[in-house]
């Protein structure tokens, strides 16, 4: 099924962000022009590899009772920063200022075609906090954002109070299972992925426990950018992020994180990037994420893991109330 309308209906946006206004009826560009975010979006100018870039972010003020703390939310590979809205709302209500960036290559940020680095992403994030005058933060990272959260905490430990990792990938070194895959092969595979195939991929790979309509905006974004004249740039940028995940493991440094750390894992989440490229006999060994999180937490100075049984990869959307209660309980410990 090919979806090429170039528009997002109000019902689809509301499925993700109930309080968001209807988006303008514009085509979706590769920086998600025409796709509404639930809060005002600003941009940090950056120069990398000779390219002038813009890093998009939402800087959401606290509610009525500010607690003087700031939360930094780091998105996953397949999701725009706007999917954090249920968590933003819960944090604001308890007094947090919330900073929610789209990393370079994602969401409303620029889409360069050069290779990505977790170290560069961490530096960009630190530069954003500097611009906003933010010192210490509580960091929450989901999926690929969990890998970045680990690298950010290791690179800037003085800037992190607490670290929450929601269904992070990178809890194993995928190079031990998956051979290198050429970028051009990945581009061709992604180009040929239909909306129906991507929808099935999300549901199966992420073991999502939500009504299908709640993941439809993710499918629509991915499909609608195909109508952009800059789609080849988006495609190469997206594929480059797989190579980052594959080639820059963080599992070996997770036990070295000294900040209080909470893994929040879906018990059914067996997501493992690159699994289809692994030898058949190795695939079942990959993606035992809940167990991997428990084992890693036990090796950390101040780590622990909470497993949400019957939940998949999108924990903060599949189990919204429980996730928010667990996260806030962790962030407020001893405060």
Residue ranges and their predicted role:
Residues 30-60:
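N-terminal cap/lid segment of alpha/beta-hydrolase-fold proteins
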Residues 42, 82, 101-118, 174:
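Glycine-rich "HGGG/HGxG" loop immediately N-terminal to the catalytic nucleophile
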Residues 44, 227-298:
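Conserved serine/cysteine hydrolase catalytic core
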Residues 49, 53, 58-108, 326:
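Conserved HGGG/HGGXW glycine-rich cap/lid loop of the alpha/beta-hydrolase fold
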Residues 119-137:
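Conserved acidic catalytic loop of the alpha/beta-hydrolase fold
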Residues 141, 145, 149:
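Gly/Ala-rich beta-loop-alpha elbow adjacent to hydrolase catalytic centers
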Residues 154, 163-193:
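Flexible "cap/lid" loop of the alpha/beta hydrolase fold
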Residues 290-335:
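Catalytic active-site module of serine/aspartate enzymes centered on a nucleophile-bearing elbow/loop
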């Amino acid at each position: 099924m090919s979806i090429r309308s170039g528009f997002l209906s109000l019902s689809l946006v509301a499925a993700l962000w109930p309080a968001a206004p209807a988006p303008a009826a514009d085509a979706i560009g590769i920086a998600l022009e025409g796709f509404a975010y639930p809060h005002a979006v600003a941009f940090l100018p950056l120069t990398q590899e000779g390219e002038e870039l813009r890093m998009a972010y939402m800087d959401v003020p606290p509610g009525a009772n500010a607690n003087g703390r700031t939360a930094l939310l780091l998105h996953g590979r397949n999701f725009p920063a706007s999917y954090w809205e249920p968590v933003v709302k819960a944090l604001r209500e308890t007094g947090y200022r919330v900073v929610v960036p789209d990393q370079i290559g994602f969401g409303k940020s620029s889409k360069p075609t050069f290779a990505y680095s977790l170290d560069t992403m961490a530096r960009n994030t630190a530069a954003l906090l500097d611009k906003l005058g933010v010192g210490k933060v509580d960091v929450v990272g989901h999926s690929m954002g969990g890998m970045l959260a680990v690298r950010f905490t290791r690179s800037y430990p003085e800037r992190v109070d607490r670290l929450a990792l929601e269904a992070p990938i990178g809890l194993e070194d995928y190079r031990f299972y998956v051979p290198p895959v050429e970028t051009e092969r990945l581009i061709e595979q992604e180009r040929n992925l239909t909306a129906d195939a991507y929808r099935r991929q999300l549901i199966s790979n992420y073991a999502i426990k939500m009504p299908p309509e709640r993941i439809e905006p993710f499918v629509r974004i991915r499909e609608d950018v195909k109508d952009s004249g800059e789609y080849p740039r988006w495609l190469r940028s997206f594929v480059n992020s797989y190579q980052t995940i594959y080639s820059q493991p963080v599992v070996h440094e997770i036990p070295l994180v000294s900040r209080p750390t909470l893994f929040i894992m879906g018990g059914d989440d067996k997501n493992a990037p690159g699994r289809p490229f692994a030898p058949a006999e190795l695939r079942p060994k990959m993606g035992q994420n809940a167990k991997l999180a428990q084992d890693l937490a036990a090796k950390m100075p101040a780590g622990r893991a909470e497993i949400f049984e019957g939940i998949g990869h999108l924990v903060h959307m599949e189990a919204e109330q429980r996730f928010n209660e667990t996260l806030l309980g962790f962030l407020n410990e001893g405060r």
